[in-house]
């Protein structure tokens, strides 16, 4: 129990990552113990997601580690834009990358920001990150029985498999 109470005085460390928006609402994005290994550094995808999600046009996001021959894994962000907002995808991607670099550090730099219409989720609303990682790594992932809308996974599979730019 000391490990959960000793990191920040008067606060309990849950291991969840998130952010507070400008209206004061708290969003829990996921576990900070979901880590990727980038050039020998263990980086929390939840921490990266919290920064990505704080961008004003982002409705939701998922960050996964994709295989890289040199660094082991590279962070790749999949972003759903808030409805009704027209964006310049390249500008938004550059802003997200810069924000992650400034707030977490260069080692956590998102190498690719992919704008998607939706993220694959379970019926209870959890993003299917493990399935996304498997497809990105070239594995033949079965469609989970708990998936809310299988067409979302079919639609983004080519984007998951695309090489990092």
Predicted region positions:
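Short solvent-exposed loop/turn micro-motifs enriched in small/polar/acidic residues
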Residues: 4-5, 9-12, 113
């Amino acid at each position: 129990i000391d490990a959960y109470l000793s990191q920040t005085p008067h606060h309990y460390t849950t291991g969840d990552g998130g952010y507070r928006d400008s209206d004061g609402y708290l969003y829990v994005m996921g576990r900070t113990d979901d880590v990727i290994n980038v050039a020998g550094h263990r980086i929390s995808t939840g921490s990266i997601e919290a920064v990505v999600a704080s961008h004003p046009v982002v409705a939701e996001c998922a960050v996964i580690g994709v295989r890289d021959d040199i660094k082991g894994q590279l962070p790749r962000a999949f972003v759903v834009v808030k409805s009704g907002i027209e964006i310049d995808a390249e500008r938004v991607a550059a802003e997200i990358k810069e924000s992650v670099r400034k707030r977490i550090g260069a080692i956590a730099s998102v190498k690719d920001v992919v704008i998607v219409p939706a993220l694959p989720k379970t019926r209870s609303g959890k993003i299917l990150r493990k399935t996304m990682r498997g497809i990105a790594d070239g594995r033949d992932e079965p469609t989970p029985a708990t998936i809310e809308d299988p067409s979302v996974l079919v639609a983004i599979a080519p984007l998951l498999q695309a090489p990092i730019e």
